[in-house]
């Protein structure tokens, strides 16, 4: 290794960047290219243009680390902290530190610590100067919360965020386990009253039906706002923001204003409007642009009626807006974007830099977004409250990132590394790697900002949810960063501060009474699952990943801390998996080479035969069968009787659906996030086989709870 390469790898280590990763496709350790490391390091703030800059940048980084004086964040688990990390010149290592701690409640505590009585944990010489590392003790018994410590060191004040958090995330009380539920994307729900896309009213209908069958949970995809005009990106995993809701799902006739708003009612009753609704309703795929445009026409009339009547409802609206100040900012951003019709990075400088004024947008558009968010909030709140009253909870999903042209990346841009994309290295399914196209969060700037954006993100979801899935939970530890312009597999892992992120997650979880499920699928480092267990996060168990070709042990059993399911939204339904349709489709989409397809088909044939034998021998099938609907029914009963605390089934598996909702890596070659369910909600109670199977699942779950 050359001296310059060694200096580059040293610099990477100082920024917590891994210089290599395991390539499971070629079964070897793969080194990140120098150009990749330079791009990632620049995104982290390192002053490097070429490899020859690494040595000087490393020396500067080392000085920065040791001259920081105080870490910007410290964690107190269950009220007790190991202290605040201090890095000081040895000449200041024995000085007195005046401390003022302001608790979240407003209470203040003051004390002075003599560092002469604190043992140094490390010593180092940097550019000829000696430094020491010590821990500044904190008082014990701190209440939960986000507290602010001001530590005056050598005459200079330093602000430190103290996160006092429970070690464990919230879990439901004993007796609330052995629950079951179903999954369907909200956009896919069909009914006799929908406007071309499922809405919160349809979700309410589904929740009530599941509750009548003894179910406890309805899971769906993220319910966050998306770009549905220009720009256009309907993926629920690329939202405009993780701090607001998707107005597409508002059930317009349920809005109180609708009853008294003649213009809105006249619009909805007009022949032209009804023809458009019927056209959207009949289509097998969701037409997001048309559906959103249609719904917006009605919402705009409702907001005008609200302001014209000037009654208690207007007062309630104004109270809501006043209580949510960032909503005003969001509405201005969306309204300005509609006028500009281009990404915020291409806006005039003042707007791009976050200074929006009244003339920069249409006032009607601003009011529309305020009103649409209020209605989305009201309907989700009613949905969650009503569902809990009926014993059914919504299982929310929090995506890993946001659209790079969206509100969060604009207003909270310092929290993001906008020069790179998050993704994943090559794996057996995606042999070229994946570029997810959104900007990852910046680990150091998050700390400097006191994790404000992360706190608001978790809190927004947990205020409504009682079950929250964290997409790609490995992202609390590290993420694969890909410099812009590089191929998907040409990235490097960047590490975060997991203790601090878990502290925020468990604190918000306990405060809101929301259990957390971590999506730990794919490439999972050895330290992730033990950390999840330590903090009482539920893991995921997916049948298609737990199958093997031994008929005596064809299915690995789920554990008592795993949410179990047959598949995910990124996988083909069970019937397609069973017939190998997923393999053929990936070949057509050029996501799988012929040799890999032959190998997968052979493996799949051995697995499906073994699973059929296993389910028959174990008593879940009355006779050996390879029919997908039989396998689904048997596997569903098998999982329902397991010790998994929660089991969630893709409802479409119950009728043998073969088309997936999403094919990762397919881009526009597949209608991702658009396919509607085969049956309307009104038809489901008449699907005798489905109703009987869900009834069996419910009985198996209750029996497992009694036995367990």
Language-model regions: role of each:
Residues 154-159:
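Short acidic/polar inter-strand loop motif in beta-rich domains
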Residues 656-706:
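Structured C-terminal cap/extension of enzyme domains
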Residues 23, 153, 184-186, 219-224, ...:
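Glycine-rich, histidine-containing beta strand-loop boundary motifs that form or position
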Residues 42-111, 121-151, 164-412:
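Acidic/aromatic-lined carbohydrate-recognition and catalytic surfaces
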Residues 106, 230-381, 401-646, 652-653, ...:
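Alpha-amylase-like alpha-glycosidases and glucanotransferases acting on alpha-linked glucans and related
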């Amino acid at each position: 290794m050359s001296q310059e390469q060694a200096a580059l790898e040293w610099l990477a280590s100082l920024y917590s960047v891994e210089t290599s990763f395991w390539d499971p496709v070629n079964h070897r350790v793969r080194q990140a290219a120098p150009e990749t490391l330079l791009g990632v390091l620049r995104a982290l703030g390192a002053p490097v243009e070429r490899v020859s800059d690494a040595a000087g940048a490393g020396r500067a980084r080392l000085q920065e680390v040791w001259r920081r004086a105080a870490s910007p964040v410290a964690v107190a688990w269950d009220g007790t902290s190991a202290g605040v990390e201090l890095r000081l010149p040895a000449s200041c290592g024995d000085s007195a530190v005046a401390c003022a701690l302001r608790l979240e409640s407003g209470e203040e505590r003051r004390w002075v610590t003599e560092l002469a009585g604190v043992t140094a944990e490390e010593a180092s010489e940097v550019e000829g100067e000696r430094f020491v590392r010590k821990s500044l003790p904190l008082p014990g018994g701190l209440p939960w919360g986000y507290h602010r410590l001001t530590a005056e060191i050598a005459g200079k004040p330093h602000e430190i965020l103290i996160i006092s958090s429970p070690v464990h995330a919230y879990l439901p009380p004993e007796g609330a386990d052995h629950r079951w539920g179903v999954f369907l994307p909200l956009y896919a729900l069909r009914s006799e009253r929908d406007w071309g896309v499922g809405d919160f009213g349809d979700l309410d209908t589904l929740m009530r039906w599941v509750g009548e069958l003894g179910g406890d949970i309805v899971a769906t995809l993220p319910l966050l706002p998306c770009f549905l005009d220009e720009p256009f990106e309907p993926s629920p995993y690329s939202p405009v923001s993780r701090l607001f809701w998707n107005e597409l799902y508002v059930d317009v006739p349920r809005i109180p204003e609708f009853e008294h708003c003649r213009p809105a009612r006249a619009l909805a009753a007009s022949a032209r409007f009804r023809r458009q609704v019927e056209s959207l309703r009949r289509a097998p795929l969701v037409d997001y642009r048309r559906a959103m445009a249609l719904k917006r026409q009605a919402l705009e009339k409702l907001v005008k009626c609200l302001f014209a009547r000037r009654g208690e409802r207007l007062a309630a609206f104004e109270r809501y807006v006043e209580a949510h100040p960032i909503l005003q900012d969001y509405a201005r951003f969306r309204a300005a974007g509609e006028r500009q019709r281009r990404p915020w990075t291409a806006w005039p400088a003042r707007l791009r830099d976050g200074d929006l004024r009244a003339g920069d947008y249409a006032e009607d558009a601003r009011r529309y977004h305020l009103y649409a968010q209020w209605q989305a909030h009201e309907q989700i709140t009613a949905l969650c409250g009503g569902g809990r009253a009926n014993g059914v909870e919504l299982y929310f999903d929090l995506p890993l990132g946001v659209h790079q042209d969206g509100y969060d990346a604009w207003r909270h841009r310092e929290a993001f590394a906008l020069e790179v994309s998050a993704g994943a290295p090559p794996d057996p399914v995606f042999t070229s790697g994946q570029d997810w196209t959104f900007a990852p969060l910046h680990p150091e700037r998050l700390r400097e900002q006191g994790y404000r954006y992360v706190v608001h993100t978790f809190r927004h979801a947990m205020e409504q949810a009682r079950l929250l899935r964290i997409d790609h939970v490995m992202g609390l530890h590290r993420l694969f960063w890909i410099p812009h312009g590089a191929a998907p597999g040409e990235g490097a892992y960047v590490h975060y501060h997991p203790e601090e992120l878990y502290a925020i997650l468990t604190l918000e979880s306990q405060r809101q009474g929301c259990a957390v499920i971590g999506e730990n699928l794919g490439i999972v480092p050895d330290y992730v699952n033990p950390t999840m267990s330590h903090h009482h996060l539920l893991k995921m168990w997916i049948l298609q990943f737990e199958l093997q070709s031994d008929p005596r042990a064809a299915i690995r059993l789920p554990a008592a801390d795993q949410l179990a399911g047959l598949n995910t939204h990124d996988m083909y339904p069970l019937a397609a998996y069973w017939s190998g349709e997923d393999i053929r489709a990936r070949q057509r989409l050029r996501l799988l080479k012929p040799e890999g397809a032959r190998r997968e088909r052979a493996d799949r044939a051995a697995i499906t035969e073994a699973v059929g034998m296993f389910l028959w021998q174990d008593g879940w099938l009355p006779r050996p069968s390879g029919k997908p609907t039989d396998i689904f029914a048997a596997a569903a009963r098998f999982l329902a009787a397991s010790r998994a605390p929660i089991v969630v089934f893709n409802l479409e598996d119950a009728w043998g659906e073969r088309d997936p909702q999403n094919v990762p890596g397919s881009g526009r070659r597949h209608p991702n996030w658009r396919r509607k369910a085969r049956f309307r909600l009104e038809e489901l109670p008449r699907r005798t086989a489905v109703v009987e199977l869900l009834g069996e699942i419910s009985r198996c779950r209750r029996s497992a709870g009694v036995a367990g």
